[in-house]
Amino acid sequence: MSSTSDVTTQVTKLLSQAGMRPRGIQSEAISAGLLEGQSIMVCSPTGSGKTLVGEMALLRAVTCDKKGLYLVPLRALAVQVFKTMKDRYEHMGVRIGLSTGDYQGSGEELDEFDIVVTTYERTDSLLRKKTSWLPFIGAVVIDEIQTLSEIGRGARLESLIIRLKKSLSELQIVALSATIGAPDELAEWLGCRLIESYERPIPLVYRIISTSDRNNSIRKLVMTTVQGNGQAIVFHRTRREAEAYAKRLAEDVGRQFTTEEKMKLDQELDSVENYNVTLSSELRAVLRNGIAYHHAGLGYNGRRIVERLFNSGQVRVICATTTLAAGMDLPARTVILSNMKSPSDYKQFLSTNTVHQMLGRAGRPSHDKIGFGVIIAGSTGEADEAKSRYFESSIDEKTNKEQLIPKYERINSTLGQASSLTEQLLVVLDMLDAATIEEIENGILGDSYLIHCAIRDSRAPMRVLQLGDISAITVLERHALPETVQSGRKNLLGRTMIREKNETVLGGIVTSVDGGQYTCRFSARLSTAGLVEGPMCSCGLPITEDGILCHHLITLGMTAASELGTLADYVIPLSLSETSPAGFLIRLGLIEGATDGKIKPTKLGRATNRLYLSIPTVREILALLPMTENSSSLLWLLRHIISIETGTTLDESFDNLLSNIITSDVPIRDLALLFGFSIGDVYGLIDTSRWLLHSISVLAELGSMTKVLELSQGLAVSLERRFTNNVEEED
């Protein structure tokens, strides 16, 4: 192995040949031991140079005859990082690879590369498959690590990090994050030295505008920016809103261009390079006015054209969805958030970190002296909500005016979600071959970020992990603070008179120590909306947002557990939607008992894990495969499980689309238009279909379902042939 000085010299030489010299946080990272193998976490604003810190770690790994992985949350971002690194380093002999999606592939072909840029999920898939070259990894860069707090994929990322650290003893981790709350807590868990910076290359001013006319207010902000020779990005809740607003603004923006500027833009759009790019007539029309919309429904080439024209200044305005928020390198003078509500749920506000990731794009280095991040509120009440939710405020000593200072959320683990625990129990068992519940809880999952945070959080419940059998007491411990449980065991919380006890409801009157009386109930009955009624208490706050039950319900639950035994063990977990991860996997036939009290994956369980299927998806496949008798029912099954995996709603138009893709010679872009799909969505659906058809084939073969196996393999072969011949030229 090369000495530290040799490594530093070689990495510095590579950077110099690429025309770069470390500065700012990059120099800080080197001083902190980056080129000596020290793991580093960088927490700093957009545009501060975080990416190069990761690249230096990867170059260090390569000079030490190791491989490097660069992990990102989105395929589009993976392509962007790949192209940048390929342009910088491949001519120096550093081989750069790209791998996204393709969960059915083994990844063995990636062994030829020194550095692989990929997504979290693809890396997780490779690790589950135990790809042969993974032991040779020396450095892993995890970009946008704040994704850890996302439901579902955050738990998968957390598990991936745990398993990488367990598998690779000398692994160097470089974690990159936008500014977040309590970054030291995350850095400590990762084993990283923290480099934190709040300095921005361009100063950013925040504003909240209260208006009864959102569209007009946005128009004024955009036009002021464009007329000042600046650029603007407007974030919208939905694709439809982004497209509609781009069309609405097109003529106004277009009038700000000179004849010469318009001519150059027209020439660019009509050039041979762009002639065959899949752009809708609507997008081409607005692009000719120097404005565009940007979302995941566009094909890759369409997004690339929009991004390139914006970076060159030929497009002045982008109306976007959140696809631009997650790491895409597109700063603008003015960034406008048109609505604070979540795209998936209008009742939910966007998270603080998500909002500041969007607004943090304001201010383009070398072009702007200042950036503006603006939130549009529909009323004074909404403006007050935006201010209290997303900002602190202070008085500027120079101007004596109020200035808004961003608030940032700490990153919370989502591994404790029941669905995530169930999946990760199977993942860990496949990794270990066999283990007891206690070995997993105290071992590999005991090293999780979930436990790391719980140990340091006074608000954490007494029991964080419960993988095995559940009872009324274990469930209460998952929803109560330690001191509450201890007081309950000593009968210090009050006394209970049980009034209701049946297979759906346990209820009674709880008299607290101060003499107050409360009507409490654990109800497993379904409401008219089809949801479990859950815990109820006349105190008005039966359960907090963090899942902590009130003292009165804990008192009722402990009394019921003592007096009613198995009835309480049945009703209380149901009322709180708690299940045993191990019990659930056993019922599905994914794990089974082994020797010495251990459990292990079945053949079906190992296949499920390595196919990268979620537990809800495999449950549906196993239930519906016996009823899949022809192509129509197979397409229905495929549509159903795609909806589960992606969280989207599909109807029969998907069946018609896929059937026509396979059987006709009509270009895919034309079929997308015919059946009402965006071209970007179609290629995503095809990719997902290829993976899930492969999964169906594997599970059908395991179940000796010859007919389904033939159907799924036939459909997969036809789809693969058509896709390979007609895939959009995205490379």
Question: Residues of each region from the PLM?
Answer:
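Conserved pre-motif I regulatory segment
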Residues: 2-43
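Conserved segment of the helicase C-terminal RecA-like domain
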Residues: 171, 330, 334-337, 341-343, ...
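Long, low-complexity, compositionally biased intrinsically disordered regions
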Residues: 453, 457-573
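Conserved SF1/SF2 helicase motif Ia
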Residues: 57-81, 167-170
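C-terminal helical accessory/scaffold domains
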Residues: 427, 435, 566, 570-731
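SF2 helicase catalytic motif II
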Residues: 116, 120-124, 130-173
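Conserved C-terminal RecA-like helicase domain
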Residues: 69-70, 79-82, 86-97, 240-317, ...
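Conserved interdomain linker/interface between the two RecA-like ATPase lobes of SF2 helicase motors
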Residues: 162, 172-253, 285-296, 379
